[in-house]
Amino acid sequence: MPAHVTPRTEDARRGAGPSSACGCSWFCHLRPVEDPASPSVCLAAVATMHGTSRTSATSVNADCCIPAGLRLGPVPGTFKLGKYLSDRREPGPKKKVRMVRGELVDESGGSPLEWIGLIRAARNPQEQTLEAIADLPGGQIFYRALRDVQPGEELTVWYSNSLAQWFDIPTTATPTHDEKGEERYICWYCWRTFRYPNSLKAHLRFHCVLSGGGGRAFLPQEHAARPGASPVAEGLGLPPKPTVPDLTAPVQAIALRPQAPAAQLAQACGARESIKREASLAPLATSPPPGKWGTPKKGKEQPDRAHSQFLGIVGGSSGGGGGLPFYPGVRSAFKPAGLARAAAQSDPYREEGGGKGPGLALGRLLGGGRAGGRPGSGESPAGHHHHHHHAHHHHHHHPKCLLAGEPPPAGLPCPGALRAFPLLAGHPEEASAFKHVERAPPAAATTSLPSARYAALPAPGLPVERCALQPLDGGSLKAYPGGGGGGECSPLPAVMPAFTVYSGDLLYGPPAAYYPLKLHLGGLLKYPESISYLSGPAAAAAAAAAAAAAAAAIGPAELGSLASIDREIAMHTQQLSEMAAGKSRARLDSGTLPPAVVAATGPGGGGGGGSAAGKPKTGHLCLYCGKLYSRKYGLKIHMRTHTGYKPLKCKVCLRPFGDPSNLNKHIRLHAEGNTPYRCEFCGKVLVRRRDLERHVKSRHPGQSLMAKAGDGPGPEPSYALEPGDPKSEDSDVDVCFTDDQSDPEAGGRGEHDS
């Protein structure tokens, strides 16, 4: 926040910037800031939305039709889109913009640079009209129209998927449903509830202290320009810092005019070398005091709850160890349990501990990740490095590029071409509040891995299978100890390059350019039958052997050692499904299947109970009690027993019901001419003979059902035939792999009908 507010700054904050302020306002952010206490109009407007003020509720509305694909920007200043986003829209003045000679201007003729900071963040994709994009990682940020914006519609913006991954913003959010069936989005760290998905994403990134996002959200120089930073590195907050950090130096703007390609190349090389010199000091320096750097001490005590699905790769070099954090995949607010476990096992950077070595050899990490200490323990060589890196950057965004300790050789070229290859698509997750899970018998978990099929790779292995880097010209090269590949593996350079993931592409390269990285991620990606960039069948077999060795290095005991179930693990469907499968297997072994399941799997159902025990069970899992339902509708009705939601009512007595079958049976009690069954032991009236038999068995054990049930009608078919009756409204709804005593819908159904 500026020290004092000038009239121009106040006008910009209210969205009524003077018309004379912008003869060349498109480039007002290009001039150096001579007086930090009185910023320009456009910088004040951007600071209003992203960093300093909550009072302004000015919105930007379209006064005419805005075509799809129109670009606005670049966005100047510190970019913190969504920092003050909430579910509620505060009313306020509206700034109308219209197209004039192909350019979007406001009522006073001001260019987008004056009011682009007033565009509010979108709460959900339905109301979003613009998306924030960047052409290159670290490039300038623009707004692009997603569709044709109609007159009177508000302009709202949110991150594109590639930009969200770069800024550590979750890209997906799975809704849950409250007792009224309305969608809600819950933060499983602090238990806050939101109505819109983007509100949850912004909360996780900027405000949730338990998830680690709140401590890095209020930094005055985050993503700010620094002297000597390259144009590529300024927009997304990856500028090289001086060797001696100075957090009190005023932020100065730099020229962003297009430069010659040669000048950009030399400047990028200098920026990369500056980052490298800073990284080389990280393992040697001690942790600075919290008062100087502002790093909260509780950051060391936070549990391993990493939302980012990234993999820490440590490369040993000739001159010393250096960390190479690598961020594959999409950062989701609700991560599948399989990926969470894989990231926790292969992610030494998220754990704290005292470093005992310069670095972990990449070959050992690829071979099983056991030589450098178990991740999560104090033996991890990367623990100290990550702690210092976390404090050194003052909780900035995790840098997507970090070079190793040694500078490149003098003869190392710096080509300017930017190349990449797209990552292979992974297994899609169902966007549903009730996840579909599949459980197999215990024997299926120990089957051998095929040697030539990538599609059959096990999910719970070390995500790295094989890493082959393109040989760099100049400098000494060395090969890593292969995991069964012999001489088929490409050599690794002595100076490890930088890594980055942007827009679905995995990039690496020397200090001046990125190159494609050939990397296979076991369990995270689904491979096709053949991969063209593997060097022949021998290399494919070597990669499969390395994957099998990595999977075999993790024993069943380690895979089964899960933490105690808390609020976060309650959303991990794989862990809960394992618990439910264990209960189901125990019931199968003890022969205590419910009658409905026994009848369905009997001679009339196409198989006996023994054959059902060897078949994998698929279904929908209840996250409250662990029951497994064969159909989603059955789980939906069952969930009402936990939430107490009863949307159905009897039209005669207005009694509420949550299960339609219970309501149908209750209505039959009011029907004339349909005399129900009556229990001769307690006088309870029931609708069907099946209900009477179940009632006698559960409430009057040891008693036998009489042939004549009260004043009921003639005898009905035996109990064993009724589960297959097409008129049945109970068992045909769904099959639950539980016993009657633990099922409130089955065992306690008699009480519901009273």
Swiss-Prot record:
Subcellular location: Nucleus
SMART domains: ZnF_C2H2
GO MF terms, alphabetically ordered: chromatin binding; DNA binding; histone methyltransferase activity; RNA polymerase II-specific DNA-binding transcription factor binding; zinc ion binding
Name assigned to this protein: PR domain zinc finger protein 13
Gene3D superfamilies per record: Classic Zinc Finger, SET domain
Protein's GO biological process: GABAergic neuron differentiation; hypothalamus cell differentiation; methylation; negative regulation of transcription by RNA polymerase II; neurogenesis
Gene, per the UniProt record: Prdm13
SUPFAM superfamilies assigned to the protein according to its UniProt record, in alphabetical order: beta-beta-alpha zinc fingers, SET domain
